[in-house]
Amino acid sequence: MLPSQSPAIFTVSRLNQTVRLLLEHEMGQVWISGEISNFTQPASGHWYFTLKDDTAQVRCAMFRNSNRRVTFRPQHGQQVLVRANITLYEPRGDYQIIVESMQPAGEGLLQQKYEQLKAKLQAECLFDQQYKKPLPSPAHCVGVITSKTGAALHDILHVLKRRDPSLPVIIYPTSVQGDDAPGQIVRAIELANQRNECDVLIVGRGGGSLEDLWSFNDERVARAIFASRIPVVSAVGHETDVTIADFVADLRAPTPSAAAEVVSRNQQELLRQVQSTRQRLEMAMDYYLANRTRRFTQIHHRLQQQHPQLRLARQQTMLERLQKRMSFALENQLKRTGQQQQRLTQRLNQQNPQPKIHRAQTRIQQLEYRLAETLRVQLSATRERFGNAVTHLEAVSPLSTLARGYSVTTATDGNVLKKVKQVKAGEMLTTRLEDGWIESEVKNIQPVKKSRKKVH
């Protein structure tokens, strides 16, 4: 039987570290609602507090770089919604949460719903650029979906009247705030698509709080805007207000007035462009006419100076002159060619190459014979001289001397030894005999005294 596996043994440090990693990796980031208590802010600028409900509580920390983005001062007993990461403070083993953002409970819940819906629709690709429809340029009719009593409608109509008074506008009045507003906005969008009277829609309202603008964060409104066959320009609130409708719409305008600017043409600017184009066209026509008139005058003058009858007469005279010159030149050329042919025929008859060829062949044969004889004599003499040189060379060759029993000894530097003083004891010598070399070492040096000859 296999021995049972021993249970893992943790140190306290390892246990706390393992629990912290499990909390951070498994739980991730969460939204938590609760009541603030025990709120403190030390000199470091960090916030420390407890978040609790009726039956439980948890310690919280919000570091300075995160709490600087909070737009209110947390109070004891205040209900809030926080976005936080769950962790464990390892030195004490305290379970706590690290808060990243904080909002009052009312706005916080709405913001949470906003983020959840935004993530959902984004996952469905409703915000993708590939689904955005281009706006008509220019628009022939504008539809406006907003409150008939709101300031947004007044701003839109004022801008359209100023920029393009002739542009038709169709108003689809609807409530933009309250529980019934999302349904009314959806029906207005669907009605505009059914009637198909306009080629662009402005959907929006004036500014307000998050609750006031909440109708444009409704999922039904977002899907109706996405499904609209008519391009939709969202114009909700002020430039800092961003709603779900802005992401789904084909174009977001920061304000209702800006939306009117986008869908309309500036009539005054168009008039200035037309006037400028007209002036350029008139200048171009004047220049063209003046240029054509000047060209016509030049051509007319040239026609007067070069009447066809006069030109034909001059051309006829020139043609006759050229014909005479050509006939004279042709006759002279034929005469010169005939004379040259006669001279060449005479020279050819006088200089028949056959005799020259015969003499040249005879001369070549003679030269060949003389060359062969000269080479034979020179080769014989050269052979004789070579034999004499070989005989002489063999007579004076050192090898012949070696063959008679003599030898040649050289030092290590290759010099031939003539006297004993050229070497020292212990040096290596090389001796050449008739049939090879001998390597030897100098053991002893004994000079031979020369005997003096007696003079009688």
Swiss-Prot record:
- Offer an example of a GO molecular function term for this protein: exodeoxyribonuclease VII activity
What are the record's GO terms for cellular component? cytoplasm; exodeoxyribonuclease VII complex
Function field: Bidirectionally degrades single-stranded DNA into large acid-insoluble oligonucleotides, which are then degraded further into small acid-soluble oligonucleotides.
Q: Which InterPro entries match?
A: Exonuc_VII_L (IPR003753), Exonuc_VII_lsu_C (IPR020579), OB-fold_nuc-bd_dom (IPR025824)
Keywords of the record: Cytoplasm, Exonuclease, Hydrolase, Nuclease
**Family to which the UniProt record says this protein belongs:** Belongs to the XseA family.
Compartments in which it is found:
Cytoplasm
One Pfam assignment: Exonuc_VII_L
Q: Name one GO biological process term.
A: DNA catabolic process
Report the top EC class in one word.
hydrolase
The record's section on PANTHER family has:
EXODEOXYRIBONUCLEASE 7 LARGE SUBUNIT (PTHR30008:SF0)
Q: Does the keyword Nucleotide-binding apply?
A: no
Identify this protein by name: Exodeoxyribonuclease 7 large subunit
Subunit structure, per the record? Heterooligomer composed of large and small subunits.
Nucleotidyltransferase in keyword set: no
This enzyme catalyses:
Exonucleolytic cleavage in either 5'- to 3'- or 3'- to 5'-direction to yield nucleoside 5'-phosphates
EC number(s) on file: 3.1.11.6
